[in-house]
């Protein structure tokens, strides 16, 4: 039975102080609280209904992203410029007057002056409205932003839902499938193929740029396409169309910020924006389309792809699979560790890090480049082109927009996929991403959702660990350190402070060293039952099998 997605249980929200409990051992509710997972919904960048708070007019009006007030306090040390600078050059033909840069790194006022509660919900519409109004440069000045907030969307979400194909085609046969329904949006004509996923306030559809008017994402535009590369041209025509009502401006803002804050080597690991249209009551977010599926898809189909772990599969009715080969699982974990370090250095918390929000990434090699067999952590030898692409930033947090030491509290009903602090109604910051990554690593290894237990240490501090023992033939010290660090981040820090970026970097480097030494293991041969691919289980061979599986799925 494949892993199943489900709505988290609804529970009243109470705030408790962060204090240690005097108990010897406590088992927390596992991610598979329900005994049997009947069905797993395919990937969708839309979060569940309980994860989204409705936006108000404060984020949709024409003045939503500007304010005439200019703060008089000196700039904070940690603030950096946060606005889109792609259109910083003016079009004036005459010399323009000297304009001083915003005093707070792209913000009009010091966030401490906004009067935000701490803790607060990161999806509270009043909070998001205040943050957007405090931006020094309106988002409407961004090149891929179409500001139509003075008019309504005229029921676009309902219309697209009505005409989208009910049957989901194979990823490999989309281009030659049924004729899509044409949706005209401003100067663009977009063909709607079918729904990819649905949430409480919107849905995601597979769409196609029919007239070539949808701009490419920054990463796509920087990669040249050969004239005879028909497959790549078709892939570029495809896009993921996220339609929401009310309009969701915040996710667009975060995605645009990351394309300027992240190191160039990490930008391809975050889904790129192609065009965003904001109406008074709806929004259309056009994103890169990931045709190779998600890590969760791969876990559920690991045996068919020929990349499953040698461990026996779970008992019938238990849900899940046997997980991935350890080498392949560690490769994806390293990619996510590197990306998470980059996000946190950019002062961004993803807030909804889970395995079905991780697309498998296969980028084209550079001209004249060959993919080497031996793993290279620095991305050389073609290894930069393989990895993950993170999606769904609807709950993401830009810490540069908040006062220092800001904490957060969930106003949605937390589920077993959420971090311990959320489930215990305690304030949190980076913990949500750490627990999310632990859950992904666990699922890659075991083929099912994470289960954790807790115990009280010698100094009276509660410590969390995974419930399932690590298999003896795995790299037990490496995985133990990873899970201990992610599940107990304050204990991993020398001073009990967050984030623990350096500590995670140390774990990542150890894993990279092991991969470099063991990425070309000999002697173990596996034949994929569906595709008949026989290859030694080295890392490059495993990734080739994943690519073949993705193309034929």
Question: Where are the regions that the model predicts?
Answer:
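Ser/Thr-rich, low-complexity intrinsically disordered regulatory regions
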Residues: 1-133
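Juxta-kinase regulatory segment immediately upstream of eukaryotic protein kinase catalytic domains
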Residues: 98-193
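ATP-binding glycine-rich loop module of kinase domains
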Residues: 193, 198-257
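Conserved structural core of kinase catalytic domains
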Residues: 269-327
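Activation segment signature within eukaryotic-like protein kinase domains
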Residues: 332-333
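Catalytic-loop of the protein kinase fold
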Residues: 340-385
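Helical subdomain adjoining the active site within ATP-dependent kinase catalytic cores
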Residues: 382, 424-428, 435, 439, ...
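Activation of the activation-loop gatekeeper triad in protein kinase-fold domains
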Residues: 389-397
């Amino acid at each position: 039975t494949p892993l199943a997605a489900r709505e988290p249980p609804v529970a009243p929200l109470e705030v408790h102080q962060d204090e240690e409990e005097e108990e010897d051992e406590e088992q927390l509710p596992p991610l598979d609280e329900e005994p049997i997972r009947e069905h797993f919904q395919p990937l969708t960048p839309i979060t569940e209904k309980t994860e989204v708070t409705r936006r108000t007019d404060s984020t949709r009006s024409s003045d939503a992203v500007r304010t005439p007030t200019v703060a008089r306090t000196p700039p904070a040390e940690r603030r950096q410029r946060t606005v889109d600078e792609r259109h910083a050059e003016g079009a004036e033909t005459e010399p323009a007057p000297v304009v001083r840069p915003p005093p707070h790194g792209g913000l009009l006022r010091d966030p401490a002056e906004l009067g935000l509660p701490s803790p607060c919900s990161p999806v509270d519409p009043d909070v998001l409205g205040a943050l957007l109004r405090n931006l020094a440069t309106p988002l409407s000045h961004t090149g891929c932003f179409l500001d139509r907030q003075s008019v309504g969307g005229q029921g676009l979400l309902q219309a697209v839902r009505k005409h989208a194909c009910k049957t989901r085609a194979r990823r490999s046969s989309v281009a030659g499938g049924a004729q899509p329904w044409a949706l005209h949006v401003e100067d663009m004509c977009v063909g709607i193929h079918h729904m990819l996923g649905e949430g409480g306030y919107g849905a995601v559809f597979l769409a196609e740029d029919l007239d070539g008017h949808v701009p490419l994402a920054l990463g796509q535009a920087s990669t040249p396409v050969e004239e005879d590369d028909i497959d790549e041209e078709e892939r570029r025509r495809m896009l993921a169309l996220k339609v929401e009502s009310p309009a969701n401006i915040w996710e667009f803002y975060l995605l645009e910020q990351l394309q300027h804050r992240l190191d160039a080597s990490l930008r391809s690991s975050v889904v790129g924006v192609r065009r965003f249209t904001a109406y008074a009551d709806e929004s259309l977010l056009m994103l890169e389309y990931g045709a190779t599926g998600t890590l969760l898809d791969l876990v559920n189909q690991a045996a068919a792809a020929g990349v499953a772990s040698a461990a026996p599969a779970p008992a019938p009715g238990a849900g899940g699979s046997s997980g991935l080969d350890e080498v392949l699982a560690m490769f994806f974990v390293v990619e996510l560790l590197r990306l998470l370090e980059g996000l946190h250095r950019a002062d961004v918390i993803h807030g909804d890090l889970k395995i079905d929000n991780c697309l498998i990434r296969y980028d084209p090699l550079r001209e004249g480049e060959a993919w080497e067999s031996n793993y290279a952590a620095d991305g050389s030898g073609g290894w930069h082109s393989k990895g993950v692409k993170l999606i769904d930033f609807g709950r993401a947090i830009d810490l540069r927009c908040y006062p220092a030491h800001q904490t957060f509290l969930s106003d949605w009903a937390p589920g077993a996929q959420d971090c311990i602090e959320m489930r215990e109604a305690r304030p949190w910051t980076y913990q949500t991403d750490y627990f999310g990554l632990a859950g992904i690593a666990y699922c890659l290894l075991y083929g099912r959702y994470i289960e954790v237990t807790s115990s009280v240490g010698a100094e009276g501090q509660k410590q969390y660990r995974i419930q399932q023992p690590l298999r003896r033939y795995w790299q037990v010290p490496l995985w133990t350190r990873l899970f201990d660090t992610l599940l107990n981040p304050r204990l991993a820090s020398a001073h009990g402070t967050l984030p623990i970026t350096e500590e995670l970097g140390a774990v990542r480097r150890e894993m990279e060293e092991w991969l470099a030494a063991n990425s070309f293991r000999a002697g173990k041969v596996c034949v994929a039952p569906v595709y008949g691919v026989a290859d030694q289980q080295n890392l490059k061979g495993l990734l080739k099998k994943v690519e073949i599986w993705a193309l034929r799925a």
